[in-house]
């Protein structure tokens, strides 16, 4: 089936079956014969329609003879009318009597008087015609646009074939050799004849030989590029000369319509203007040729024809775009298909649909989770056809017309019928932007008065909806299959868990949380305190009777016979829960986190139905008690801490001290800045803590005895914040504590904090300082929303064809998971990371070596619990990264479907879910940056390591010297300190910073909380390893260092500055008394090079002891961290861009030594134990992070900055790169408190690593440097080995997501993504086949997607259902047995 057939499919059953059986679509270059074959006649005139009769002109652009009749079954002159003459061709006007819709599919053509080059093959870089003829673009354009001649046959002259010569050169050659001595050509004709002469078979052999013979890499690259195009032509049966056209197609007139407007004017498609231009110029050229006009005039006309055709195909690609009457560039054929408004994205991937409507949403607190309120008026419009058919069926209306009238009159019976039609008919609700799949869910409609859609409050978080004027769209699924999918898959009750991380997304929030928190708080001396009850029901009765108060602490015997200490409110909540949830889950104050845990437990243990019922009950009770509590905000709730004044004064004194030190020259400006910011951060934190302390507890007095007791506060703001209903400590601090430090738009923190709170009011200066942060937030929001949406689009495109395709791929490879530690503390335990994954190898008990779990076990909550109990510290799991499936991923490598809680089904679109999970929070976070209001959210710098466990110290690769105070100073950065327990298991591990003081020794037994090492967080010291005398070298004032005198202090510091000349190398050596440089560890001279910004702490010639500090370098000034920095970082990683601050990476393991400098760059040498040393050049001003004599592993960073991903891949391999990418991206999201499962990132990284670069093609058909799909590479190599040829070798390759999307095997998917013309040009040249395996391609050709319920193996499966006997309805019995599980659903 050709593309042509696809787009001319009529609605007959045979054709629809045809489209279903469509196997693939191929795109090739159209030959002139093809174009003539498509055509129904030649368009000879530029006329469109007759201005008097409005009928199309004959042989014009709208000619009825060529394209078909304007009116159904009526010829142009009116001789034949109606169906009876069908198929007759009118002898008078030549029009076939047929349906007018053929004007949508019949094409015409224009025979060109001179050949014309196709602009796509000429201008798409690299130019296809240019590469094939081995000509530069400039030369080719000169020839095509009649600027220069090209030699076709040099004859007896000294010119070479295909040499480009100007008019003057040509005249000189003719003068010299005579006119017949050579043949030259100009324009597309010449290019066409050169293309015709090419013998591609010979050219292929010749290029292959040249490529093997040459040593030059650039030449090899050039030859390979040319060879690729030659091979493409040979394999696709395209002919090179077809890139130059002698006939062009004219698209059907209905696709470029001419529409009459009121007032006798016409609106026309731009294409008509472009076609008219071509026809006019073509006709003029024909006439000039017939008249035998001078050569120069004909040449000019040919050039104009070439330009007109260029504009038709791609206006504006070359030269200035042709504009219409209003100065707007005309829309060419290329513009029709590319971009957001093009055919692909506007009409094929996104369509407007019937049976839909939109309205404002309001909250529906009385709804059940599976319901939504649908306005009656809206329902009437949406369900009209159903109502018509029902009216007819009941005999209330005889025809559809009368039914229509009844509905328009809104008769009473219509509303009754509407009720019935709508009952249990699922409808879909969608809120834009639909960032993840929970943005469309289905509900059962309840008809409501008014015009607003009512939405259940618990689904708001999934939609990210609020009721400040948001609108939502309603869609009605029509077919039975669609309704079943809505009910079974999309119903809100089936979407309780988030696909991004598997935690519940249907979780009570705001008022409900506040109500539940209020219910479960306890309070001293309440009515009925210390009463004992025999069962929970008795508590409820006592409460209803007013015997006990809601917050009273009481004793209750539970069903298992145990007596528990609890409160009345908690028992009331317990009554709502499914019985399998333990009482301990509610015997606590219910905050938002606890409620989420409760819902999650209920889902895992009691199932979906019980959870849905629980959520609805929690919602009702929460609202009721929030109303009863009457929690509200008043100004006096904002209590300003009494100690605030003192804290601020203390901080101010510290800052004054720091300023004084700065004035005395003891510290530099950067240090001062860092310290001041730190003091204020700490002060703000202290004020905040004081405020929370004061606001968080109340003193309650017993009215009878007068006894007093501190209780959890009932302050409204505190309750809202603590419960997680609204607001956080940060906002409370700004309201009642102090606003704290603010950030400038550049991200720097302003040193002066705002010491007032909103309650006290801000001064003018403070208000002005605040505006910085606020405005930055607003600007960021606007910019980043677009950025984030674009990131999501790229992510979706790269993984859109990743589907779960089989159960087990049989891989023996996987990845190792361990705890994620930060500074020695476990940040994310192994059990959390392994949850929902499948074990690759069996897991054994670390102590007894007993088998705990066999391979291929899914790690669920129970398995994870055992891993924690047995203290398993590492497991090997299966991962998407190591899955061997040829297409998609297998079930076992993916693991659990996070949104459903069971192992993933075959056919699940895990790729798109991964893209949505990563993209969605990006948008959310960018929209939320300004919530912190730019208040500097900066953590206080860490300056020591503290033991988290008792144990024994083990030091590795630690070099330390003892200073004059007897303390050990750590040298270098490769030293590590670990703590092991009695069993020899490593409990924590720290990398010791350079210059830190080590406070423990090897093998020392330590206790928990002991300080292990400490350091100056603001400065990095350079510590001497040996005693001796200081000798400066290249430390020259004004050249390499500057004495910076502080105006205020009159003190000077010597700071190393950027030095212009290359031969300076400031360093400090330590010499003996004879002036010889001493040696330190590893036999390296004791010379310390000083980076830019280092501050010298010693004088030339001074005596020095080991462990003394020679110089210090202030650490970087801190900027506020914000996802705004994070989003570009995520995009940078996914796009594999070169980081701005690129680090130098060591490719081998070995010892680092400094080796002087060359060409203005510093040289580092890494010497391995065996093998050759490797040199690295580090640019000036880049800070080297390793010290002389350090040991580095392959892939370790030698300088500060981020490593380039290609370097990581080369030095450490795919697995490490995948882990690095996952960790770096998670870092950004985790910082913002967003949980995304690792597997989503892995799915995307898998797509980035799906290709390899061929190093040696061996006996295969690959080319050197070609990028090949891993699957394809494996298949080809297996085939080659089977036939006794040498297999190819390749190295892994990492592609950015845009690149990976554009190099996908489906050209339809790639074309609809970006660079449409380029993708289509390449694909047509290669005669590419698209096998329609992804989702996008199938949507574009109008089929069901091959995933989910449309997964091909499901669609082609017949299911036999055995007959079942009808069973009597047991509903009432069930109800009696267990009233909790049977509900009014």
From Swiss-Prot:
Which protein, by its recorded name, is this? DNA-directed RNA polymerase subunit beta'
Q: Where does Zn(2+) 2 bind?
A: 809, 883, 890, 893
Name the family.
Belongs to the RNA polymerase beta' chain family.
What EC number(s) does this enzyme carry? 2.7.7.6
Gene3D superfamilies, per this entry? Answer: 1.10.132.30, 1.10.150.390, 1.10.1790.20, 1.10.40.90, 2.40.40.20, 2.40.50.100, RNA polymerase II, clamp domain, RNA polymerase Rpb1, domain 3
Q: List, in alphabetical order, the GO biological process terms annotated in this UniProt record.
A: DNA-templated transcription
Q: Which organism is it from?
A: Nitratidesulfovibrio vulgaris (strain ATCC 29579 / DSM 644 / CCUG 34227 / NCIMB 8303 / VKM B-1760 / Hildenborough)
Tell me the function of this protein: DNA-dependent RNA polymerase catalyzes the transcription of DNA into RNA using the four ribonucleoside triphosphates as substrates.
The record's listing under Pfam families reads: RNA_pol_Rpb1_1 (PF04997), RNA_pol_Rpb1_2 (PF00623), RNA_pol_Rpb1_3 (PF04983), RNA_pol_Rpb1_4 (PF05000), RNA_pol_Rpb1_5 (PF04998)
What do we know about how this protein assembles, alone or with others? The RNAP catalytic core consists of 2 alpha, 1 beta, 1 beta' and 1 omega subunit. When a sigma factor is associated with the core the holoenzyme is formed, which can initiate transcription.
Question: Known InterPro entries for this protein?
Answer: DNA-dir_RpoC_beta_prime (IPR045867), DNA-dir_RpoC_beta_prime_bact (IPR012754), RNA_pol_asu (IPR000722), RNA_pol_N (IPR006592), RNA_pol_Rpb1_1 (IPR007080), RNA_pol_Rpb1_3 (IPR007066), RNA_pol_Rpb1_3_sf (IPR042102), RNA_pol_Rpb1_4 (IPR007083)
Q: May I have one GO cellular component term? A: DNA-directed RNA polymerase complex
PANTHER family noted in UniProt: DNA-DIRECTED RNA POLYMERASE, DNA-DIRECTED RNA POLYMERASE SUBUNIT BETA
Which residues of the sequence carry a binding annotation for Mg(2+)? 466, 468, 470
């Amino acid at each position: 089936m050709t593309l042509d057939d696809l787009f001319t499919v009529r609605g007959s059953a045979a054709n629809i079956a045809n489209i279903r059986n469509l196997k693939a679509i191929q795109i090739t270059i159209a030959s002139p014969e093809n174009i003539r074959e498509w055509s129904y006649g030649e368009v000879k005139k530029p006329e469109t329609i007759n201005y008097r009769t409005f009928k199309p002109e004959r042989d014009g652009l709208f000619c009825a003879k060529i394209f078909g009749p304007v009116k159904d079954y009526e010829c142009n002159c009116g001789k034949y009318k109606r169906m009876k003459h069908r198929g007759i061709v009118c002898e008078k006007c030549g029009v076939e009597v047929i349906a007018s819709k053929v004007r949508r599919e019949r094409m015409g053509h224009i025979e060109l008087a001179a050949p014309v080059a196709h602009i796509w093959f000429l201008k798409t870089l690299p130019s296809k015609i240019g590469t094939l003829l081995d000509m530069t673009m400039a030369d080719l354009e000169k020839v095509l646009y009649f600027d220069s001649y090209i030699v076709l046959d040099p004859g007896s002259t000294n010119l070479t074939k295909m040499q480009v010569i100007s008019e003057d050169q040509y005249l000189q050659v003719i003068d010299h050799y005579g006119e017949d001595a050579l043949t030259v050509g100009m324009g597309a004709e010449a290019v066409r004849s050169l293309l015709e002469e090419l013998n591609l078979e010979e050219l292929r052999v010749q290029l292959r030989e040249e490529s093997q013979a040459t040593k030059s890499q650039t030449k090899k690259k050039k030859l390979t590029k040319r060879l690729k195009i030659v091979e493409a032509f040979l394999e696709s049966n395209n002919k090179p000369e077809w890139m130059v056209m002698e006939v062009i197609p004219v698209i059907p007139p209905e696709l470029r319509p001419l529409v009459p407007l009121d007032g006798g004017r016409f609106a026309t498609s731009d294409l008509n203007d472009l076609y008219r231009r071509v026809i006019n110029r073509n006709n003029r050229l024909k006439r000039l040729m017939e008249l035998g006009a001078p050569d120069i005039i004909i040449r000019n006309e040919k050039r104009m024809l070439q330009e007109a055709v260029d504009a038709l195909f791609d206006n504006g690609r070359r030269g200035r775009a042709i504009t219409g009457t209003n100065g707007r560039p005309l829309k060419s054929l290329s513009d029709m298909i590319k971009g957001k408004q093009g055919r692909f994205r506007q009409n094929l991937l996104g369509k407007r649909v019937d049976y839909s409507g939109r309205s404002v949403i309001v909250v529906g607190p009385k709804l059940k989770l599976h319901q939504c309120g649908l306005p009656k008026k809206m329902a009437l419009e949406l369900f009209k056809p159903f109502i018509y058919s029902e009216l007819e069926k009941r005999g209330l209306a005889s025809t559809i017309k009368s039914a229509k009238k009844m509905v328009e009159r809104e008769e009473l019976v219509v509303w009754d019928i509407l009720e019935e039609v709508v009952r249990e008919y699922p409808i879909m609700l969608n809120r834009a932007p639909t960032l993840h799949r929970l943005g469309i869910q289905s509900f059962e409609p309840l008809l409501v008065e008014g015009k607003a859609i009512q939405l259940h409050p618990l689904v708001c978080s999934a939609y990210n909806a609020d009721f400040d004027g948001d609108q939502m769209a309603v869609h009605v699924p029509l077919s039975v299959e669609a309704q079943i999918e809505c009910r079974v898959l999309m119903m809100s009750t089936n979407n309780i868990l988030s696909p991004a991380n598997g935690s519940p997304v249907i979780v009570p929030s705001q008022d409900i949380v506040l109500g539940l928190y209020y219910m479960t708080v306890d309070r001293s001396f309440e009515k009925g305190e210390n009463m004992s009850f025999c069962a929970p029901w008795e508590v409820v009765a006592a409460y209803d009777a007013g015997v006990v108060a809601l917050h009273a602490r009481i004793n209750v015997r539970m069903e298992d016979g145990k007596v528990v200490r609890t409160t009345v409110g908690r028992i009331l909540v317990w009554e709502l829960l499914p019985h399998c949830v333990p009482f301990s889950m509610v015997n606590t104050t219910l905050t938002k986190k606890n409620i989420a845990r409760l819902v999650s437990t209920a889902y895992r243990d009691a199932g979906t139905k019980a959870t849905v019922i629980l959520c609805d009950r929690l919602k009702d009770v929460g609202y009721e008690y929030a109303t009863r509590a009457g929690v509200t905000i008043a100004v006096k709730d904002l209590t300003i801490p009494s100690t605030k004044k003192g804290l601020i004064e203390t901080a101010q004194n510290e800052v004054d001290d720091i300023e004084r030190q700065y004035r005395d020259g003891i510290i530099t400006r950067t240090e001062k800045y860092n310290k001041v910011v730190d003091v204020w951060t700490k002060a703000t934190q202290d004020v905040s803590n004081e405020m929370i302390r004061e606001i968080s507890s109340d003193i309650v007095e017993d009215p009878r005895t007068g006894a007093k007791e501190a209780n959890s506060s009932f302050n409204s703001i505190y309750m809202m914040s603590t419960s997680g209903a609204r607001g956080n400590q940060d906002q409370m601090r700004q309201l009642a504590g102090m606003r704290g430090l603010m950030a400038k738009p550049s991200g720097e923190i302003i040193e002066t904090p705002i010491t007032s709170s909103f309650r006290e009011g801000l001064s003018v200066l403070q208000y002005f300082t605040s505006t910085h942060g606020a405005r930055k937030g607003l600007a960021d929001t606007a910019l980043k929303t677009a950025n984030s949406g674009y990131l999501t689009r790229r992510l979706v495109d790269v993984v859109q064809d990743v589907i779960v395709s089989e159960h087990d791929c049989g891989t023996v490879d996987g990845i190792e998971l361990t705890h994620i530690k930060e500074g020695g503390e476990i940040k994310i335990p192994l059990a959390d990371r392994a949850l929902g994954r499948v074990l690759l190898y069996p897991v054994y008990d670390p102590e007894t070596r007993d088998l705990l779990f066999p391979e291929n076990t899914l790690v669920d909550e129970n398995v994870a619990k055992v891993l924690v109990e047995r203290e398993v510290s590492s497991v090997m799991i299966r991962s998407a990264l190591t899955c061997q499936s040829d297409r998609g991923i297998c079930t076992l490598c993916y693991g659990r479907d996070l949104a459903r809680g069971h192992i993933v089904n075959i056919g699940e679109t895990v790729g798109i879910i991964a893209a949505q999970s990563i993209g969605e929070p990006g948008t959310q976070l960018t929209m939320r940056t300004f919530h912190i209001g730019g208040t500097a959210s900066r953590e206080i710098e860490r300056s020591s390591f503290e033991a988290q466990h008792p144990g024994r110290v083990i030091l590795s690769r630690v070099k330390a010297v003892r200073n004059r105070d007897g303390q050990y100073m750590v040298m270098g950065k490769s030293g590590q300190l670990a703590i092991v327990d009695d069993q020899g298991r490593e409990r924590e591990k720290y990398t010791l910073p350079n210059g830190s003081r080590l406070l423990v020794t090897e093998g020392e037994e330590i206790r928990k909380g002991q300080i292990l090492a400490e350091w100056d967080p603001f400065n990095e010291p350079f510590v001497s390893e040996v005693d001796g005398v200081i000798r400066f070298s290249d430390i020259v004032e004004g050249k390499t260092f500057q004495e910076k005198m502080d105006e205020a202090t009159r003190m000077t510091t010597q700071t190393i500055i950027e030095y212009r000349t290359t031969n300076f190398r400031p360093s400090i050596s330590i010499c003996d008394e004879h002036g010889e440089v001493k040696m330190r560890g590893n036999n390296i001279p004791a010379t310390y090079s000083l980076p830019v910004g280092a501050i010298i702490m010693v004088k030339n010639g001074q005596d020095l002891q080991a462990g003394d500090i020679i110089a210090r370098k202030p650490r970087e000034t801190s900027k506020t961290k914000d996802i705004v920095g994070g989003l570009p970082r995520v995009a940078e990683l996914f796009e594999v861009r070169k980081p701005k601050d690129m680090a130098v990476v060591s490719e081998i393991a070995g010892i680092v030594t400094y080796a002087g400098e060359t060409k203005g760059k510093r040289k580092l040498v890494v010497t391995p134990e065996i093998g050759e040393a490797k040199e690295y050049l580090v640019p000036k001003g880049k800070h080297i992070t390793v010290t002389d004599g350090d040991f580095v592993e392959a892939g370790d960073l030698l300088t500060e900055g981020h490593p380039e991903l290609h370097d990581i891949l080369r030095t450490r391999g795919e697995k490490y790169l995948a882990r690095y990418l996952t960790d770096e991206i998670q870092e950004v999201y985790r910082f913002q408190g967003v949980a995304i499962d690792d597997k989503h990132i892995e799915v995307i990284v898998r797509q980035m690593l799906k290709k390899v670069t061929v190093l040696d093609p061996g006996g295969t058909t690959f080319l050197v440097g070609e990028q090949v799909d891993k699957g394809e590479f494996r298949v080809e190599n297996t085939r080659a080995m089977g036939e006794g040829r040498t297999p190819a070798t390749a190295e892994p390759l990492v592609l950015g997501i845009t690149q990976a999307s554009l190099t996908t095997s489906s050209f339809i998917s790639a074309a609809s993504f970006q660079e449409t013309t380029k993708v289509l040009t390449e694909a047509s040249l290669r005669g590419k086949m698209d096998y329609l395996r992804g989702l996008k391609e199938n949507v574009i050709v109008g089929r069901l997607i091959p995933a989910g319920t449309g997964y091909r193996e499901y669609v082609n499966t017949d299911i036999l259902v055995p007959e079942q006997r009808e069973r009597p309805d047991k509903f009432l019995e069930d109800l009696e047995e267990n009233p909790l599980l049977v509900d009014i659903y």
